[in-house]
From Swiss-Prot:
Subcellular location: Cell inner membrane; Cytoplasm
GO terms assigned for molecular function: ATP binding; metal ion binding; protein-exporting ATPase activity
Subunit structure: Monomer and homodimer. Part of the essential Sec protein translocation apparatus which comprises SecA, SecYEG and auxiliary proteins SecDF-YajC and YidC.
Pfam family, one: SecA_SW
Descriptive protein name: Protein translocase subunit SecA
Source organism (scientific name): Ehrlichia canis (strain Jake)
Primary enzyme class: translocase
Signal sequence segment: none
PROSITE patterns membership: SECA (PS01312), SECA_MOTOR_DEAD (PS51196)
Family stated for the protein in its record: Belongs to the SecA family.
EC number: 7.4.2.8
Length: 862
């Protein structure tokens, strides 16, 4: 029934493309008009468009001439003319959708259309990339085009200082990474004045490689953290005991990456702990005093039995560096939480760093949903269209290729063992190499890429390795992977954002070859020679069959496999793709059904013999689909919990911004209300019969909160609790009135600054502890389901109650801190120094990332 409807009405995707093609015809119709304009007249069109918007026109009203202007400027400045399909891609982005365009279709150029149009409003456009290299490259490359149209362009990299960041955010168009934008948001909400903040709002974002940022990294929170006091020696002590455990002592769940002690394992570890005096004799591991030890044990087990060196992490300069499971890139500055990172450091016999406490956090899911309009680009989004729509309200539109794809996708070859599989891969690579066909081999981990590299070396096949260890050479290596006879090994999809051009990348080859040449004539001659060579090499590569892409394992996500395939066959070039699998591969071993294995046995698999069957390929894709659905459910569930935290984050940040925006607080009004509540609370809690002991408690509380000493002789004569409350309210009011007047009379501005700073620091201090409490609550909340309770509803209720308590403590804390404030303490504002913006972890003696200039332990680490 559905297929009949598609035939009659067309799919939703085809209807969108059809409607945009009509607009393309209008753009093409006026192209000649803009060809006649001078460069200056073309630039002045930007001013005209801005005036039209001021006079009531919308962006949609000026889309046709604006796109025509960008296309004409691109021809003149970049020598590139937007194809019709690229114009459609630009319209998709402008409409707040995801533009799925195959590799080599020019996504970088497509973004200029929507970016220019939306920049005309003057509210800022953010173009988001996955790394600093791409942000810098695209800002410089496309910056020439924007400059020709009078549009300002900024770029923020990891090492950009605060002043440069602020200036970059004021530009019409900003290029940066998702990490830089997210951390700037968190840091801005740790600043002590609006003038120190760098961001200016969330208008429109175009996210390049949108699937990588909004899906692959969706579960990775952005965290600014500080060190906490901790017994780090315990990690080493527990690590030494893990070697005593055997397989029967624990249960491993590879799908969920969880591990549990068996009954035998619990008994063995308890005996070992007692023997090494780590727990008292005759106590259980599950006794309340020993629960923390269990935490150390589980994390040590995970470090040893689940997380693998050169797959999940590498060691660089004596530190554990996490490897992104989707891109194979190093995630510098990121640390595993909850003690896992320390357990890995203990396992690898490295220096153990203290665990961290969260100072500020958010997720990419919630960060990017703050933008008024959001769009994205990628070569592979259709398989995740449900998630994009469900979480981000983003529709995926598949853009037709400019020239039909010529790539041939061969069936998978399946072998019994990994050894047989890699033997077949080497043989296939050798055959391609003999006819000078360029080969790109995709692996799932650094370990596998280096194993394959050794095999190629043994077979005397020259090759390049592209993985997290050699990140700096990534762009150059991947750009030259199309040269005839070249063999390139790439971990997953490292090198995304750089096209593989058959014959080689002329621009990059020239940059390297001419780096030390200054003579203009020599440069021209050499460039011409290189151009001819690239042209000939391209023809040789085409005759050999184009780029051959080999996958050595199926990934959990079909999208990652499609990304690898998509490197071949760009812009109508010929190409080939093929996957080699084995029954020992993680996907088939963990997620593959027994049915697949049963069929393979019936087919009679022999040593070094491959089996090809469309049913098996479909079954593997079904297994991948199951994993994708499971991962989506996990992300969706995590988002529901994070939405609760995000709503609280908005409340606290809004309160913080209102404090920052108010230069003069009439704190006396707040005090009168607060003091009445605090006095009532103290009396209710501490006042029973006013004997000596009760008086001491009461006096201690008043000294702690108000810095006041109570007169026992006066209080002892009061007849009732009400009279005591009345008297205490009176002396507190008098105390505050006198204090406020004294400060104001000496320096009103300094007093206002002191009040604001005390309020901000108090809120930040409590919010930090509140985040830690929410993390603890979230960790154990799923156990409520055992009692037939909905964990999410339980989390919402308790989190709300915790927030109420936090805000009550906030008012008490500012009362206490202002009560103890003395005028002789220096309260002058400090200059805001530059600080390393790559900090996601702060030691207690480092400068606080809020920009106060103080050490962390004296500021947000108090």
């Amino acid at each position: 029934m559905l297929s009949i409807a598609h035939k009659i009405f067309g799919s939703a995707n085809s209807r969108i493309i059809k409607s945009f093609y009509k607009v393309v015809q209008h753009i093409n119709a006026i192209e000649h008009e803009f060809q006649l304009l001078s460069n200056e007249a073309l630039k002045n069109k930007t001013i005209e468009f801005k005036e039209e918007l001021k006079n009531g026109k919308t962006l949609d009203d000026i889309l046709v001439p604006a796109f025509a202007v960008v296309r004409e400027a691109s021809k003149r400045v970049l020598n590139m003319r937007h194809f019709d399909v690229q114009l459609i891609g630009g319209m998709v982005l402008h409409k707040g959708m995801i533009s799925e365009m195959k590799t080599g279709e020019g996504k970088t150029l497509v973004a200029t259309l929507a970016a220019y149009l939306n920049a005309l409003e003057g509210k800022g456009v953010h173009i988001v990339t996955v790394n600093d290299y791409l942000a810098k490259r695209d800002a410089e490359w496309m910056g020439e085009l924007y400059d020709a149209l009078g549009i300002t362009v900024g770029c923020i990299l990891t090492d950009t200082n605060d002043l440069e960041r602020k200036n970059a955010y004021q530009c019409d168009i900003l290029y940066s990474t998702n990490n830089n934008l997210g951390f700037d948001y968190l840091r801005d909400n740790m600043k002590f004045s609006r003038s120190e903040m760098v961001q200016r709002g969330f208008n429109y974002a175009i996210v390049d490689e949108v699937d990588s940022i909004l899906i692959d990294e969706a579960r990775t929170p952005l965290i600014i953290s500080g060190q906490v006091d901790q017994d780090i020696k315990m990690y080493k002590k527990i690590d030494n005991l893990i070697y005593e455990l055997v397989e029967e002592d624990y249960e491993l769940e590879e799908k969920s990456k969880n591990i549990f002690l068996t009954e035998a394992g619990t008994t063995k570890i308890e005996n070992l702990l007692t023997k090494h005096n780590l727990i008292p004799s005759n106590t259980s591991l599950y006794d309340i005093d020993n629960i923390i030890i269990m935490h150390y044990i589980i994390q040590a087990l995970r470090a040893h039995k689940i997380f693998a060196l050169d797959k999940d992490y590498i060691i660089k300069n004596g530190n554990i560096v996490i490897i992104d499971e989707f891109t194979g890139r190093m995630m510098d500055g990121r640390r595993y939480s909850d003690g896992l990172h320390q357990a890995l450091e203990a396992k690898e016999k490295l220096n153990i760093n203290s665990e961290n406490q969260t100072l500020a956090s958010t997720t990419f899911q919630n960060y990017f949903r703050m933008y008024t309009k959001l769009s994205g680009m990628t070569g592979t989004a259709a398989t995740e269209s449900e998630e994009f729509l469900g979480i981000y309200n983003l529709q995926v539109v598949q853009i037709p290729t400019n020239i039909p794809v010529q790539r041939i996708d061969l069936n998978d070859d399946i072998y019994c063992t990994e050894e047989e599989k890699f033997s077949a891969v080497i043989k296939f690579i050798s055959e391609c190499h003999q006819k000078l066909q360029p080969v790109l081999v995709g692996t799932v981990s650094i370990e596998k890429s280096e194993m394959l590299s050794k095999l190629l070396t043994q077979n005397k096949l020259k090759h390049s390795v592209l993985n997290a260890r050699y990140h700096e050479q990534e762009a150059y290596i991947i750009a030259q992977a199309g040269i005839p006879g070249t063999i390139t090994i790439a971990t997953n999809m490292a090198g995304r954002g750089t096209d593989i051009q058959l014959g080689g990348n002329l621009k990059m080859l020239a940059k390297t070859a001419l780096a030390n040449t200054t003579d203009k004539e020599a440069i021209e001659i050499k460039y011409k020679q290189l151009s001819e060579k690239v042209k000939k090499d391209k023809e040789i590569a085409i005759q050999a069959g184009g780029l051959c892409v080999i996958g050595t394992e199926r990934h959990e996500s079909r999208r990652i496999d499609n990304q690898l395939r998509g490197r071949s066959g760009r812009q109508g070039d010929p190409g080939l793709s093929k996957f080699f699998l084995s029954l020992e591969d993680d996907l088939l071993r963990i997620f593959g059904s027994d049915k697949i294995k049963g069929v393979l046995k019936k087919l009679g698999m022999k040593k070094d013999e491959a089996i090809q069957h469309t049913w098996i390929s479909r079954s593997i894709e079904k297994a991948q689909h199951k994993v994708e659905s499971r991962n989506y459910d996990i992300r969706k569930s995590l988002l529901k919990f994070d939405n609760v935290i995000n709503e609280q984050r908005k409340v606290v940040f809004d309160q913080r911004n209102r404090i920052l925006d108010n230069d003069s607080y009439d704190i006396s009004i707040i005090y009168r209300d607060l003091n009445s509540e605090i006095v009532n609370s103290i009396i209710h809690d501490k006042y029973y019969n006013l004997d000596d002991e009760t008086y001491k408690i009461l006096s201690s509380e008043f000294t702690r909160i108000y810095a006041l000493t109570l007169d026992y002789s006066i209080i002892s004569e009061l007849e009732s609790k009400e009279k005591v409350i009345e008297y205490l309210n009176k002396i507190v009011d008098e105390h505050f009135t006198q204090k406020i007047e004294e400060f104001k009379s000496r320096d009103q501005k300094l007093w206002d600054y002191a009040v604001k700073k005390v309020m901000i620091m108090s809120l930040d201090y409590l919010w930090r502890d509140h985040l830690a409490a929410l993390d603890s609550l979230k960790c154990g909340i799923n156990l409520r389901s055992i009692a037939q309770k909905d964990p999410l509803n339980e989390f919402k209720a308790e989190a709300f109650s915790m927030l109420e308590n936090m805000m009550n403590k906030f008012y008490e804390l500012i009362t206490q801190r202002l009560s103890h404030l003395r005028f002789d303490i220096e309260l002058s504002e400090t200059q805001i120094p530059e600080y390393n913006i790559n900090h996601t972890k702060i030691s207690r003696n480092e400068k606080c990332p809020c920009g106060s200039g103080k050490k962390f332990k004296h500021c947000h680490g108090m």
